[in-house]
Amino acid sequence: MKNFKFIISYDGSRYFGWERQPGRDTIQGKLEAVLTRMCGTDVQVIGAGRTDAGVHAKAMAANAYMDTERTPDEVRDYMNRYLPDDICVQEAKLAADRFHARYRAAGKLYTYTCYVGDTKPVFNRKYVTVLDYQPDLAAMQRAAEYLTGEHDYKSFCSNPQMKKSTVRIVDSIEIVRRKDLLYFNYHGTGFLQNMVRILTGTLLEVGQGKRTPESVKAALEAKDRTQAGYTAPPQGLCLMRVDY
């Protein structure tokens, strides 16, 4: 039995997220179906994270234990031959037996993209969230300073039944504008359910003048979901990289 590591890109627009669900199209489900076909026995694919419905990935890391004589390149090519066009295995290689895509991950980089142009974005509309206002970049950057570091991010988690620790480390939040696109780059050791989208929604409320930068600090300290901002739509979010 060999342990294969994969780097996978996908357009999450038509999927119900990463995690397999009976009767629904998911990324994990599609990958497992192809590998099970290839091996002739059930194969479980372990992802570095579980992206939500409609969220994309440029470089999701995953691994799977398989009994096959195919080389990593042959496995990659087989998968890409039978996967839908909106999922692509960029890389396949052999990993150490103990490698686990989720538990060995040291950090993740997510980017949330907003469109702030004057006209509708035709060609990248599935990968951005369109804003009908010009957010205050400086105010959002000030607010982001309160959100970096090691904190209890319970206010920014959509799962009220979360029993495990909601303490996480967010190393950096970078907010930059390039022409008609506004990028929110988040790097951290791990993120809670919907956390990046709630952080983004909260920062956008600051940018729109609906709350002050200082209110973000109060929301963080409250450990109460109702004190943070709205959950930004899924299409603007993309997992860019997983660090090991």
Predicted regions and their residues:
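Structured-RNA-binding interfaces characteristic of tRNA pseudouridine synthases
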Residues: 1-244
